[in-house]
Design a protein with these regions (language model features):
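A short beta-turn/loop motif at secondary-structure boundaries
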Residues: 347, 462, 501-503
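Amphipathic alpha-helical "coupling" segments that flank catalytic cores
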Residues: 334-337
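Divalent-cation-assisted or electrostatically stabilized phosphate/pyrophosphate-binding catalytic cores
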Residues: 61, 493-500
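Flexible, glycine/threonine-enriched loop-and-boundary segments that flank and lead into catalytic domains
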Residues: 450-470
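Cytosolic, long alpha-helical scaffolding segments
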Residues: 384, 408, 415-416, 478-493
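Charged catalytic and DNA/RNA-contacting regions of genome-maintenance
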Residues: 1-332, 348-361, 365-457
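Short terminal or interdomain "cap/linker" segment that borders an active site or interface and mediates
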Residues: 492, 501-517
Length: 517
């Protein structure tokens, strides 16, 4: 390591902490990959493989992609089942003293994608976790882009296989006996060939730590309230899932707000062969949606609705009371053409609120996402009004549970301009008049010279020093220059910085404040 250049030493320090990830290492306007990562990515994405001096006799293999278009390349790699670690520059290279500080700002794996460009809006993107002993198993599924989590336990591996077939996760965490169980591994390789499998240590599933994580992130004090006290292996699986997210996607944990526990008997059990033969969501031959039951029934007008009807088809209701209640709701909507049509028109205007909120929680949203959320929220009063016209128990329940979120809508509309830039660094996204300090900083940025001249004139009048000047250098920032002949007139609130041959430089607190801004 000692013979490597400082930059390569930094690269290996970061890479050694992320050995299972392809490391996108920011260098100027590019994300670069080195050594084996570079060879693999150049082959997978058909990129030119070059080299870079690294302090050793042989040049380091290297390939790269422009940072502004990196998401497209990352999406292709994630789709192929690779895990990505994005290493960003943490300071301006022009201002850095020595080597630029860098660190991992984001990790992307097939089961933890939140970027809209990498997701199919019509289906959930699940991360699964399976924990098993020889007799018992627990399994859970999380879509961190929407915040929904399902969990159950069982004593039968057939149930585990059926659930994996139903949810079709992109990534599977495995612990305990599941890691070495040949039939489990064979099922995944044959039936879920696109899924990435991550073996995990037993300590990640330890019961007390798992229970504490569940209490912390799902805000559950008493497991008896939702039945978790009777689902011990579901607790193990949830603990392993949360442990993985803590280590790789800590920001995602704030968005997991919808834990749904279920038992096998709540839904009709369909094994993989039945699902395939019935062509519920994909055809046997082409694996496409067209020609399936979902293709016929999915006449939804929102991405959220499209995902929901897929879930309904994948998980047919089993309880006759629940089936009848849903049928009555559908019948009520069909019978009232006027209100149904009006409701449909409003729903067409609703953006994907689940994933918008997810991106906001994880810090990957842009300003237009905020405006899109406000626009979607603005539709809620009309939606609730039209639903209230239906005299049916399920629709009434939906109506009562709609939170209009007016405070959130008002905050966004008051703070963000109507047509904001996509990138934060472009500026101009906060409305004038919303925040006094931001308005002042904006004034300094756009008309700073005029304000400095005004301050200079004010200080001349206040001190009686006619030749007082305001200057600037990189060491002190803005400063006030006063000649030696006028040193007696310098006020007490000026702080001496250095003495010149013909006078002194002083800096008062107002000027210092502007420099810091």
């Amino acid at each position: 390591m000692a013979e490597l250049t400082p930059m390569m030493q930094q690269y290996f320090e970061i890479k050694n902490k992320n050995k299972d990830y392809l490391l996108f290492y920011r260098l100027g306007d590019f994300y670069e990959l080195f050594f084996d990562d570079a060879k693999l990515v150049s082959r997978e994405l058909d990129l030119t493989l070059t080299g870079r001096d690294c302090g050793q006799e042989e040049r380091a293999p290297m390939c790269g992609v422009p940072y502004h278009s990196a998401e497209g390349y990352i999406a292709k790699l994630v789709h192929k089942g690779y895990k990505i670690a994005i290493c960003e520059q943490l300071e301006d290279p022009k201002q850095a003293k020595g080597l630029v500080k860098r660190d991992i700002i984001r990790r992307v794996t097939p089961g933890t994608v939140v970027d809209a460009s990498m997701l199919d809006e019509s289906r959930n993107n699940f991360l699964a976790c399976v924990y098993a002993t020889h007799e018992d198993m627990g399994i859970c599924f999380a879509d961190i882009s929407t915040g929904i989590v399902y969990a159950t336990d069982t004593e039968d591996w057939t149930d585990i296989f059926n659930e994996l077939a139903r949810f079709a996760p992109k990534e599977i965490l495995a612990g305990g006996f599941a890691i070495s169980f040949d039939e489990f591994r064979r099922f995944i390789s044959e039936r879920l060939e696109d899924a990435l499998v991550e073996p995990m240590e037993d300590e990640c599933f330890e019961s007390e730590a798992a229970a504490e994580r569940i209490r912390q992130y799902f805000h559950i004090e008493d497991f008896k309230e939702n039945g978790l006290n009777m689902m011990h292996f579901a607790v193990h699986a949830l603990g392993g899932l949360l442990d993985y997210l803590e280590k790789t996607q800590p920001a995602s944990l704030a968005g997991l707000n919808d834990l749904r526990l279920y038992r096998q008997g709540q839904y009709m059990e369909l094994d993989l062969n039945a699902r395939r033969n019935l062509e519920l969501c994909e055809t046997m031959r082409t694996k496409e949606k067209k020609g399936t039951l979902l293709w016929v029934l999915d006449q939804t007008h929102t991405a959220m609705g499209s995902r929901m009807i897929r879930q309904w088809i994948e998980k047919p209701l089993y309880n006759p009371l629940h089936i009848t209640r849903r049928q009555q709701a559908v019948s009520a909507l069909c019978d009232d053409v006027i209100n149904r049509s009006a409701l449909t028109d409003v729903l067409r205007q609703v953006f994907d609120m689940e994933r918008l909120i997810g991106r906001i929680v994880y810090g990957t949203a842009n300003c237009r996402d905020l405006r899109a959320l406000a626009a979607a929220i603005s539709c809620l009063p009309e939606i609730r009004s039209y639903l209230a016209a239906f005299d049916q128990s399920l629709l009434k329940e939906l109506t009562e549970n709609i939170d209009l979120l007016q405070d959130v809508q008002e905050l966004i509309e008051q703070a963000i301009v109507e047509d904001p830039p996509i990138l934060l660094r472009d500026g101009g996204l906060i409305r004038s008049g919303y925040h006094e300090e931001i308005d002042h900083l904006r004034s300094l940025a756009s008309g700073g010279k005029g304000e400095i001249a005004a301050i200079e004139q004010r200080e001349r009048e206040r001190t009686g020093i006619p030749k007082l000047k305001i200057g600037y250098n990189r060491v002190f920032g803005y400063y006030i220059e006063v000649s030696r002949a006028n040193s007696e007139a310098v006020p007490e609130n000026y702080v001496r910085k250095q003495t010149l041959a013909n006078g002194g430089d002083y800096c008062d607190y107002y000027i210092t404040g502007n420099r810091e801004r």
